[in-house]
């Protein structure tokens, strides 16, 4: 309190909220999707030249949205109108470490190239393109939907493929989409010491990639 007067009924709010950058510019509170909120200080009084210190904690969920070019999690802080007039901190949220390790298996073991990473409604979408090799002649790209929900690792692969299909005695070029789903429990994807089970990741991903290794479909 930098003034010479007593200040009463002090309220401090902290809100963890998700916002699309072009939408939150309007200042409309409805543009935010609240994840969690706390009120570290409520109804306090502050003497002239005094200050209040308080501890607080906001935890991110395992399946919280990551930061990308269009949207992010923000920490909003202020008083009664924190959503409209409060300050904000743009949080740089990365992919969950276990999901990051799972994803790295594509790039390190199978030489896929990551093209983009986006936060969707309840998962992270990653676009992967295959290496130039004879192993995946029909594969154009993979959309990988990743999340950890209630401690379970869930991944859905959407394969975009092209190849040859039999039409009687003839062969024709066709394009198709295939899907493969992987689910793992913490007992499966974690080793003692909470290290990621990279060997299992390789096995699961290799099983999924068998779809793309088929030359005729």
Regions found by a protein language model. Give the residues of each.
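Well-ordered beta-strand positions in beta-sheet-rich domains
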Residues: 38-43, 85-90, 179-181
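Intrinsic-disorder/low-complexity, polar/charged segments enriched in Ser/Thr/Lys/Arg/Asp/Glu/Gln
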Residues: 51-55, 86-88, 141
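A surface-exposed loop-and-adjacent beta-strand signature within N-terminal beta-sandwich domains
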Residues: 2-58, 186, 200
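C-terminal interaction module
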Residues: 117-216
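Short glycine/proline/serine/threonine-rich loop/turn segments at secondary-structure transition edges
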Residues: 62-74
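Short beta-strand elements
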Residues: 82-105
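Localized sequence-composition bias
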Residues: 103-123
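Beta-strand elements of well-folded, non-transmembrane domains
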Residues: 1-2, 14-20, 60-62, 77-81, ...
């Amino acid at each position: 309190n930098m003034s010479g007067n007593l200040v009463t009924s002090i309220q401090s709010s902290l809100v963890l909220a998700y916002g699309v950058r072009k939408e939150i510019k309007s200042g409309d509170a409805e543009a935010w999707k609240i994840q969690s909120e706390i009120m570290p200080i409520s109804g306090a009084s502050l003497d002239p030249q005094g200050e209040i210190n308080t501890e607080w904690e906001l935890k991110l969920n395992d399946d919280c949205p990551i930061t990308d070019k269009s949207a992010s999690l923000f920490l909003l802080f202020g008083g009664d109108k924190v959503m409209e007039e409060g300050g904000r901190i743009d949080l740089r949220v990365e992919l969950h470490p276990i999901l990051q390790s799972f994803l790295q298996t594509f790039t390190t073991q199978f030489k896929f190239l990551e093209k983009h990473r986006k936060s969707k409604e309840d998962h992270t979408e990653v676009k992967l393109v295959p290496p130039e090799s004879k192993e995946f002649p029909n594969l154009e790209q993979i959309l990988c939907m990743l999340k950890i929900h209630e401690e379970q690792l869930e991944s859905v692969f959407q394969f975009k493929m092209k190849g040859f299909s039999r039409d009687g005695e003839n062969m024709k070029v066709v394009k198709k989409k295939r899907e493969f789903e992987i689910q793992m429990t913490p007992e499966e994807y974690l080793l003692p010491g909470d290290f990621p089970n990279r060997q299992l990741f390789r096995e699961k991903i290799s099983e999924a990639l068998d779809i793309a290794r088929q030359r005729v479909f």
